[in-house]
């Protein structure tokens, strides 16, 4: 499946919530008419079946992290193989992706922009260039913007946006040095309460 490159608001409207696909400069409610689904004007949401709810939750999380269907299923399989709560482990695997960590550190204003920075070799992990967005960052890893990329306007803008958004507890960031430390894998309580990972587990357990 190809990566979606269409309007970001369309995806957020489809899921009925902010997927954080845009920079956050303008409030979500002003950017996207979230109460209306894409398509015919004025069309409202219908009551979903249990399967429909499970599918929508999976799509919401998959789109939020910018992961393709096959990749997402592989993350679920890996989470199911590990010891612990499968849904929580799934979210932790997604949060540990390098593109997500770059976004969390504020070097990219969106996960999509962070993914571009990684693929364009603007990011290093422990001093070594890594250009694989799905690279799993481990506790203690230091993620930094490479010297040649530090003057990019989009990174400077992203850091300004991140300052307003605030830092997350599991990451330390030195915005002046443009580097940060992934202190620990986040606990479930640290992550969005707007995600019901149990619905995803129910979907894939069928």
UniProtKB/Swiss-Prot annotation:
Which keywords appear in this protein's UniProt record, sorted alphabetically? Answer: Ribonucleoprotein, Ribosomal protein, RNA-binding, rRNA-binding
Gene3D superfamilies from the entry? Ribosomal Protein S4 Delta 41, Chain A, domain 1 (1.10.1050.10), RNA-binding S4 domain (3.10.290.10)
Function recorded in the entry: One of the primary rRNA binding proteins, it binds directly to 16S rRNA where it nucleates assembly of the body of the 30S subunit. With S5 and S12 plays an important role in translational accuracy.
**Cellular component terms, GO, for this chain's entry?**
small ribosomal subunit
Q: NCBIfam families from the entry?
A: PRK05327.1, rpsD_bact
Its assembly, as annotated, is: Part of the 30S ribosomal subunit. Contacts protein S5. The interaction surface between S4 and S5 is involved in control of translational fidelity.
- Which gene specifies this protein's sequence? rpsD
Alphabetical list of HAMAP family matching this protein: Ribosomal_uS4_B (MF_01306_B)
Family affiliation: Belongs to the universal ribosomal protein uS4 family.
A Pfam short name: Ribosomal_S4
Q: What is this protein called?
A: Small ribosomal subunit protein uS4
Q: Write down the InterPro entries for this protein, in alphabetical order.
A: Ribosomal_uS4, Ribosomal_uS4_bac-type, Ribosomal_uS4_CS, Ribosomal_uS4_N, S4_RNA-bd, S4_RNA-bd_sf
Residue ranges of domain S4 RNA-binding in the record: 96-157
């Amino acid at each position: 499946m190809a990566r979606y490159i269409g309007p970001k608001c369309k995806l957020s409207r489809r899921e009925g919530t902010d997927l954080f696909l845009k920079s956050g400069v303008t409030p979500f409610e002003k950017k996207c008419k979230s109460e209306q689904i894409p398509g015919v004007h004025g069309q409202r949401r219908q009551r979903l079946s249990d399967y429909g709810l499970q599918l929508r939750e999976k799509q919401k999380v998959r789109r939020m992290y910018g992961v393709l269907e096959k990749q997402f299923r592989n993350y679920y399989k890996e989470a199911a193989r590990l010891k612990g709560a499968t849904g929580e482990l799934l979210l932790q695997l997604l949060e540990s992706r390098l593109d997500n960590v770059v976004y969390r550190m504020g070097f990219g204003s969106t996960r999509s922009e962070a993914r571009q920075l990684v693929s364009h070799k603007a990011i290093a992990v422990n001093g070594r260039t890594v250009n694989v967005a799905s690279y799993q960052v481990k506790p203690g890893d230091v993620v930094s913007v490479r010297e040649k990329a530090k003057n990019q306007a989009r990174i400077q803008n992203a850091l300004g946006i991140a300052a307003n958004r605030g830092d997350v507890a599991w990451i330390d960031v030195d915005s002046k040095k443009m580097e940060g430390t992934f202190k620990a894998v986040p606990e479930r309580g640290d992550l969005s309460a707007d995600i019901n990972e149990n619905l995803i587990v129910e979907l894939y357990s069928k």
